[in-house]
Amino acid sequence: NLDIPVICRINDADDAKPKGKVPYHEKYKIDHYFGYIPEPFFHKHYPKSFKYKEIFYGVEPKLYENLTPYSKRIKERILCSGAAGRTDLLYRLKDLRRGTAFSVWKHYKLRTKCIELPYVYYTSTLQHEFVNDKYSSLLMKYCTSIAAHSLYPVIKYWENTAAGCLTFMEVTEKNQANILGFEDGKNAIFINEKNYEKKLSEFISDPNNTKWAEIAENGRNYTMTNLTNDIASNSLVELFKEYIFQ
């Protein structure tokens, strides 16, 4: 019953209706939402009247210090981790029945395609020792990594770059990952369903090209300047001020 603003963090907006989340707005008297999903995607699943702010959190700077030098990392394979589906017909038919909000294929279509390539090393979210705060240690083992989500950008995009990986990231009109501010060929390599094999093979066929290390370093610098928890905290403070000093 305290008269204080209620700020709510949100991740998967597309399950708002299937999980009955919208009524929570009135129940908990939520004033504002924040998260890393693009604003248009949030309002596609929540009423336009709900206030939302994009804040990119997840990279804790101290976990990305003392990086393994790029030259000493694995370069024969490209790392891809996290949830993924399968491409066989039976799996895809079963997946369709889940609906868009819970469809692995809808969320991870390109990631699923990437892991079928022979030079991509794939590990699921928990099938390794490098979980939670140790995830950066897994990333630091590899020169390159893949960050792909077909509906919106996820934390992997800025975790991978923070770890000094040359990051192949899915950036399309649909997933609106351009909101992160990365630039293709400068601090990341943009991929999509049409060009991913070509882009990934360009690295595998010439892994010692100095341009890769330069792009990786640029990606790390951009992330540590714009996409860390320190920056996110400042953004949250500014959001709080809007309500405290109104």
Language-model features: where?
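Nucleotide-sugar donor-binding catalytic core of glycosyltransferases
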Residues: 1, 5-159, 166-180, 230, ...
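CheY-like receiver
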Residues: 138, 199-203, 239
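Residue-level signal for the nucleotide or nucleotide-sugar donor/cofactor binding architecture
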Residues: 155, 191-194, 227
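Short, surface-exposed helix/turn micro-motifs that flank interaction/cofactor sites
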Residues: 161-162, 220
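A short acidic/histidine/glycine-rich donor-binding loop in glycosyltransferase catalytic cores
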Residues: 184-191
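C-terminal "capping" alpha-helix adjacent to the active site of nucleotide-linked donor transferases
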Residues: 192-211
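A charged, aromatic-enriched C-terminal amphipathic alpha-helix characteristic of glycosyltransferases
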Residues: 207-241
